[in-house]
């Protein structure tokens, strides 16, 4: 990955820590008489400029809750919070705690049980983890399926989505994180086949763990965002369900983060050429000319229709790996075709993978996604009760 990505990612999400150590550095330099020499004066000037940049970064992150709430209000209605039952609204959060975002890599939370490495298929990568309330309620819990990213070639279920999963599990949800077969050893569509296999496993087995198999939402970032969106838009598609073609793989909501949504963008000039070469060499292992159906079928943007589930698409405006323009086009196309609500939030200053660990932006985003999922669950419950 480009050096710029890592620099911008860590600076953007850990700005408060950079401010702290740079402030300490400035005090040390002043204490050693740096202001008495021109080099020290220039160095302190550079630190002041850095302070200004970091302050602007934190200000951008501070806008996150307003941007996310505006996106949800636009898609779901001004009264969307009131559509969530009062008992569930009571456990949601609008604020964030410094105790969390000042400990960015501390993931575990009280009251959450973690069950590891449960098999859902025959391959060594077909393993899943469950995060659930340590003390389970009287009813079955709604389910969230988390798909990790990593360019379809790397990644693990223990590395991503943890702030969201622990947050939801503390509030009565059951979260499932899966591993799946990776390229280049396995070419696409192995990745989506495993995702569908995991959905089928959840439908048949999650009740044993306290989850409700009737309501499954899906999320993921980057390649996981692609797979989450594709799974949500291709329910029961037999070509992605070898050996379980008749299985029900419908989902009830989706929250893809910074996903790849169109493998064959039109016009071709808008294509990310480095991404295209990577897909040809490592993921699909063929060109579009050699297998147009495979490329087209694997693009979420080519599978939008009126039957799509409610979707909350989140992307960073400064994503240097998956361009934000692709998310804009996908959100617009989905909103134009889907009968269900489509919310789209574009976060200023956010890089790729911005919500992997706790930060100001991450924790505000987790709160908003929890509201969307609770709204989706309440909507589903209302429809189910009326049937």
Please describe what each predicted stretch is:
Residues 1-387:
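Alpha/beta-hydrolase superfamily serine-hydrolase fold, recognizing
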């Amino acid at each position: 990955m480009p050096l710029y990505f890592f620099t911008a990612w860590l600076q953007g999400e850990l700005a408060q820590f950079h401010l702290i150590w740079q402030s300490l550095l400035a005090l040390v330099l002043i204490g050693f008489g740096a202001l008495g020499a021109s080099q020290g004066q220039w160095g302190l000037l550079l630190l002041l400029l850095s302070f200004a940049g970091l302050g602007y970064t934190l200000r951008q992150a501070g806008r996150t809750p307003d941007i996310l709430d505006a996106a949800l209000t636009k898609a779901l209605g001004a009264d969307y919070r009131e559509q969530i039952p009062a008992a569930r609204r009571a456990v949601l959060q609008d604020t964030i705690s410094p105790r969390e975002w000042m400990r960015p890599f501390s993931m575990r939370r009280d009251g959450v049980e973690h069950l590891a490495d449960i098999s859902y298929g025959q391959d060594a990568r077909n393993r899943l983890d469950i995060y659930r309330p340590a003390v389970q309620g009287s009813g079955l819990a709604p389910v969230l399926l988390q798909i990790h990213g990593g360019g379809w070639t790397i990644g693990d279920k223990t590395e991503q989505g943890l702030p969201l999963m622990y947050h939801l599990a503390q509030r009565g949800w059951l979260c499932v994180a899966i591993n799946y077969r990776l390229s280049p050893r396995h070419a696409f569509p192995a990745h989506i086949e495993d995702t569908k296999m995991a959905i089928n496993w959840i439908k048949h087995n999650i009740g044993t763990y306290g989850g409700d198999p009737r309501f499954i939402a899906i999320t993921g970032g980057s390649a996981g965002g692609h797979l989450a969106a594709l799974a949500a838009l291709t329910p029961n598609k037999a070509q992605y369900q070898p050996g379980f073609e008749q299985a029900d793989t419908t989902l009830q909501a989706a929250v893809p983060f910074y996903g790849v949504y169109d493998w064959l963008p039109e016009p071709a000039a808008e294509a990310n050429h480095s991404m295209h070469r990577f897909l040809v060499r490592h993921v699909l292992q063929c060109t579009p000319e050699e297998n147009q159906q495979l490329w087209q079928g694997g693009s979420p943007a080519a599978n939008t229709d009126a039957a799509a589930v409610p979707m909350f698409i989140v992307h960073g405006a400064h994503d240097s790996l998956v361009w934000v323009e692709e998310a804009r086009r996908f959100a617009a196309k989905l909103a134009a075709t889907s009968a269900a609500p489509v919310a789209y939030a574009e976060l200023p200053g956010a890089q790729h993978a911005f919500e992997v660990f706790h930060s100001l932006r991450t924790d505000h985003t987790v709160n908003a996604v929890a509201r969307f999922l609770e709204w989706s669950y309440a909507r589903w419950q209302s429809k189910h009760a009326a049937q």
